[in-house]
């Protein structure tokens, strides 16, 4: 029985082979791949594998055997050699990719040898009988979209990699409709050229662009658009590409620009979904490119294998013998020897109609795609969204927008918003034990608390991300690229910036700011000068040097005037009445205001002490009165200032204002290298600030610092030879931090504010702005500043860091007074000694004594008050004989002492 069954099977197989004709069980196909097509090759291999392993024998009665070559398109000999190698292996059809350098070589060989080429590359401009174009044409869809937007003035950026078909169609339509199209070929552009072009177009107020380039060049152009900030609201870009979802547009989402494009692959269809499940399981090491979703060119590659498989099935059903000898001959023979069944293969390929990853796959008799549908996408705040579709029959059809949520922030509630900030005390700092925490809990500071408050008000989840380059945000003058936190927002890496970010015009052009949450200005930070030690004669400080000199001259002048008026006024001369028993009056009437008494009177009045003599004449009293008035005012003013000067420790600052900085060169000064302060000086038209900017720009070594901490450290280490220009809020904070050796001097140079920043046109702008206003009105912002500036200060209360500090008097404050006292006492002793010696010498001559005897007698009298030797009395001054008896009389102001003699 078993033998009979086997014979029946063999007989059936024989009849089946006769019925199907001589169709090979292994179909040889070729594959030509160019550089940077790893994902397309993976799709090619996957399609062949799935066909050959299909469990349905009716769908896969034969195996596809690929012969693959990688070609270097720049080398025409290598292209020719690869094609001839494929031809010599007896392939029935070739799947291949080309570029503008290899397209003519491949199409020429195909036409000469009747070998069909199935390609996902750009459609050729001419008619090639044996070339099947898997990629649909964009001409009709693009023109319909331009009509819909009613564009009549726009820029068309293109390269020649894909030919001129779209350019030709647009220029023809422009001529018919009167459009103004600026067509620019960007084939040989580099990054700098792109930025220069975009800047020039921006000066021309060009806001509408059509970009027709291959994916690599297209992605580069989009990056340059972002780098110059032209991806913001007000710009509109139409991308002439069939893979809208293949393009990285995250930065455009945050920028706000309108971006429209086309999508050939519908990822929601069952066939694509099934393939995606299989695609995700591929080993990335064996199948390069499988780590990312398949691009539309990879989907076209997959469909190309399906087209070839369906063609061979159709030929098999038609019993067309396509078998070839192993050696197909020389492809370079002259004349060419075409393949005999090539016409049948070409005709059958064009008759294929299947449903592939790119939708309906069907060709006309020229080998071009027909009856296809492509979706129209626009970039929304949530990502690419389908807004319509286009096909040959219906043309452009726009679908009604699906109902949106109540506000755009509702879509954000389900994801985590990236908040960019900068490590800057006291705004954002690591906690002391931050290693024990994760995420946002690692940080503390003013902006950390502010971010938490804002998130509560608008109801979002957020993640704090420290800006990698540690900069606030400035635009490079050469590359036009934004750095810092502004760059993070502009290029779509973050959605909110909560940091000490100054609101400026140039930043406002590319990002949006909320209302200011803190007001401030540019200020000057210097190293706190050492407290001046009081000098020995610090008690002289209340009056200037000039005043003291004037007082001395006034004292001398008043004394001389008093002496003169006393001499000329008869009322100052008087005669003493003699007492009973005494001699008559002196020949010279006495005048008390000699020059020395005049000096003594003026000094006593100045010292508020007075003396035993007073002027008698009216003129003398006038002199005395005005001198008393003068001394009253001077002494009162001196006393009032003396208390302050002796009880206040002063710090003498070498700089008090920006003008002081500008007019000197001994103290260097600088700003943060990237920020609004530097931009302020660069753009300022005020003479003082222009002078400062000229100095800072040319100073060597550079006075610009990478971070604020670096600038503060430079101030502290410079020994007073460097001043740092920074925001007043930061200046005030650092002044309250140990080692308490910096200080703010002068007023603010300008007035500005910090704001919360969002990308241009972001849906978060309004909610964030309202949250800041609510926090301001509720007093939360003031509480946060007091908390992080003063409550956590390390240098005592705010007033204690003032410039002048009151303290108790120390010996050094009044040491000069003691020096004068000691000096005066010493001088008095010296004068007394001189007087003693002088009078002793005079007495020795008068009494005919030796000088030593006179000294001894004088000393005995000075110490004991006893009489001299031999009963003689020594008197200091006695021009006349002494009478017997005890009496005291006045003569010339000198007291004469007499005693009874035995």
UniProtKB/Swiss-Prot annotation:
Catalytic activity from the UniProt record: Ca(2+)(in) = Ca(2+)(out); Na(+)(in) = Na(+)(out); Mg(2+)(in) = Mg(2+)(out)
Residues holding L-glutamate: 500, 502, 507, 676-677, 727
Span of the signal peptide: 1-20
Topology, Cytoplasmic side: 566-592, 612-617, 835-902
Ranges within the bilayer without spanning: 593-608, 609-611
Membrane topology: Multi-pass membrane protein
Glycosylation site positions: 52, 56, 258, 371, 407, 414
Disulfide-linked positions: 84-331, 740-795
InterPro entries associated with the record: ANF_lig-bd_rcpt, Glu/Gly-bd, Iono_Glu_rcpt_met, Ionotropic_Glu_rcpt, Iontro_rcpt_C, Peripla_BP_I
Annotated transmembrane regions: 545-565, 618-638, 814-834
Superkingdom per UniProt: Eukaryota
Alphabetic keyword roster: Cell membrane, Cell projection, Disulfide bond, Glycoprotein, Ion channel, Ion transport, Ligand-gated ion channel, Lipoprotein, Membrane, Palmitate, Phosphoprotein, Postsynaptic cell membrane, Receptor, Signal, Synapse, Transmembrane, Transmembrane helix, Transport
Extra remark: The postsynaptic actions of L-glutamate are mediated by a variety of receptors that are named according to their selective agonists. This receptor binds AMPA (quisqualate) > L-glutamate > kainate.
Family: Belongs to the glutamate-gated ion channel (TC 1.A.10.1) family. GRIA4 subfamily.
Main function: Ionotropic glutamate receptor that functions as a ligand-gated cation channel, gated by L-glutamate and glutamatergic agonists such as alpha-amino-3-hydroxy-5-methyl-4-isoxazolepropionic acid (AMPA), quisqualic acid, and kainic acid. L-glutamate acts as an excitatory neurotransmitter at many synapses in the central nervous system and plays an important role in fast excitatory synaptic transmission.
Domain free text: The M4 transmembrane segment mediates tetramerization and is required for cell surface expression.
Protein name as it appears in the record: Glutamate receptor 4
Source species of the chain: Mus musculus (Mouse)
UniProt gene name: Gria4
């Amino acid at each position: 029985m078993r033998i009979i069954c086997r014979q029946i099977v063999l007989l059936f197989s024989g009849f089946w082979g006769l019925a199907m004709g001589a169709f090979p069980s292994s179909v040889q196909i070729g594959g030509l791949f160019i550089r940077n097509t790893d994902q397309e090759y993976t799709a090619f291999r996957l399609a062949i594998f799935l066909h050959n392993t299909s469990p349905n024998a009716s769908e896969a009665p034969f195996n596809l055997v690929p012969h693959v070559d990688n070609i270097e398109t720049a080398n025409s000999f290598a292209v020719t050699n690869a094609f001839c190698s494929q031809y010599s292996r007896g392939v029935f059809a070739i799947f291949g990719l080309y570029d503008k350098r290899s397209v003519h070589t491949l199409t020429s060989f195909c036409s000469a040898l009747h070998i069909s080429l199935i390609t996902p590359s750009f459609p050729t401009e001419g008619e090639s009988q044996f070339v099947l174009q898997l990629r649909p044409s964009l001409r009709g869809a693009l023109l319909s979209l331009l009509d819909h937007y009613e564009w009549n003035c726009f820029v068309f950026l293109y390269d020649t990699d894909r030919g001129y078909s779209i350019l030709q169609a647009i220029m023809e339509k422009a001529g018919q409709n009167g459009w103004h199209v600026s067509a620019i070929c960007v084939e040989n552009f580099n990054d700098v050229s792109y930025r220069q072009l975009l800047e020039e177009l921006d000066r021309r107020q060009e806001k509408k662009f059509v970009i027709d380039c291959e994916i690599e060049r297209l992605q580069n152009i989009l990056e340059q658009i972002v780098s110059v900030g032209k991806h913001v609201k007000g710009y509109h870009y139409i991308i002439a590409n069939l893979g809208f979802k293949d393009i990285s547009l995250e930065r455009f989402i945050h920028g706000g620009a309108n971006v429209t494009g086309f999508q050939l692959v519908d990822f929601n269809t069952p066939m694509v979904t099934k393939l995606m499940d299989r695609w995700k399981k591929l080993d990335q090491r064996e199948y390069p490119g499988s780590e990312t979703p398949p691009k539309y060119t990879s989907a076209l590659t997959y469909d190309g294998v399906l087209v070839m498989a369906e063609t061979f099935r159709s030929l098999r059903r038609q019993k067309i013998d396509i078998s070839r000898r192993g050696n197909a001959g020389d492809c370079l023979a002259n004349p060419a020897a075409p393949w005999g069944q090539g016409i049948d293969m070409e005709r059958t390929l064009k008759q294929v109609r299947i449903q592939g990853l790119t939708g309906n796959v069907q060709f006309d008799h020229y080998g071009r795609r027909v009856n296809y549908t492509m979706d129209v996408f626009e970039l929304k705040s949530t990502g690419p969204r389908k807004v319509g579709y286009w096909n040959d029959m219906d043309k452009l059809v726009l679908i009604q927008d699906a109902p949106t949520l109540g506000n755009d922030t509702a879509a954000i509630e389900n994801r985590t918003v990236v908040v960019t900030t900068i490590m800057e005390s006291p705004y954002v700092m690591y906690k002391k034990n931050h290693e024990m925490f994760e995420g946002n809990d690692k940080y503390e500071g003013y902006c950390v608390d502010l971010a938490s408050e804002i998130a509560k008000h608008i109801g979002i989840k957020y993640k704090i991300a420290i800006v990698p380059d540690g900069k606030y945000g400035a635009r490079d003058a050469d590359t036009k690229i934004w750095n810092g936190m502004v760059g993070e927002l502009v290029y779509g890496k973050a959605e909110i910036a909560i940091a000490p970010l100054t609101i400026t015009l140039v930043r406002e052009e590319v990002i949006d700011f909320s209302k200011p949450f803190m007001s401030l200005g540019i200020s000057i930070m210097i190293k706190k000068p050492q407290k001046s030690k009081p000098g020995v004669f610090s008690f002289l400080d209340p009056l200037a040097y000039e005043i003291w000199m004037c007082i001395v001259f006034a004292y001398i002048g008043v004394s001389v005037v008093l002496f003169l008026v006393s001499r000329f006024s008869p009322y100052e001369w008087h005669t003493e009445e003699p007492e009973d028993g005494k001699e008559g009056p002196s020949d010279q009437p006495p005048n008390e205001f000699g020059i020395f008494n005049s000096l003594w009177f003026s000094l006593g009045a100045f010292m508020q002490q007075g003396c035993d003599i007073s002027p008698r004449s009216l003129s003398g009293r006038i002199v005395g009165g005005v001198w008393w008035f003068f001394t009253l005012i001077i002494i009162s003013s001196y006393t009032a200032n003396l208390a302050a000067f002796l009880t206040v420790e002063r710090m003498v600052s070498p700089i008090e204002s920006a003008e002081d900085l500008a007019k000197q060169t001994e103290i260097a000064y600088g700003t943060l290298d990237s920020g609004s302060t530097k931009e302020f000086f660069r753009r300022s038209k005020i003479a003082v600030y222009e002078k400062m900017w000229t100095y800072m720009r040319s100073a060597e070594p550079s006075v610009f610092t990478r971070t604020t901490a670096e600038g503060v450290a430079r101030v502290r280490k410079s020994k007073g030879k460097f001043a740092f220009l920074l925001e007043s809020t930061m200046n005030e904070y650092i002044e309250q931090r140990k080692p308490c050796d910096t200080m703010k001097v002068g007023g603010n140079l300008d007035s500005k504010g910090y704001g919360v920043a969002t990308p241009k046109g972001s849906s978060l702008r309004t909610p964030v702005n309202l949250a800041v206003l609510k926090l301001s009105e509720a007093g939360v912002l003031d509480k946060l500043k007091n908390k992080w500036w003063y409550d956590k200060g390390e240098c005592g209360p705010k007033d204690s860091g003032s410039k002048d500090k009151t303290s108790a008097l120390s010996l050094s404050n009044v040491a000069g007074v003691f020096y004068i006292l000691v000096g005066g006492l010493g001088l008095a002793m010296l004068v007394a000694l001189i007087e003693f010696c002088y009078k002793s010498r005079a007495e020795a001559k008068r009494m005919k004594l030796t000088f030593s005897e006179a000294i001894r007698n004088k000393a005995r009298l000075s110490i004991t008050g006893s009489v001299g030797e031999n009963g003689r009395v020594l008197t200091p001054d006695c021009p006349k004989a002494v009478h017997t008896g005890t009496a005291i009389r006045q003569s010339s102001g000198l007291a004469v002492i007499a005693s009874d003699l035995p």
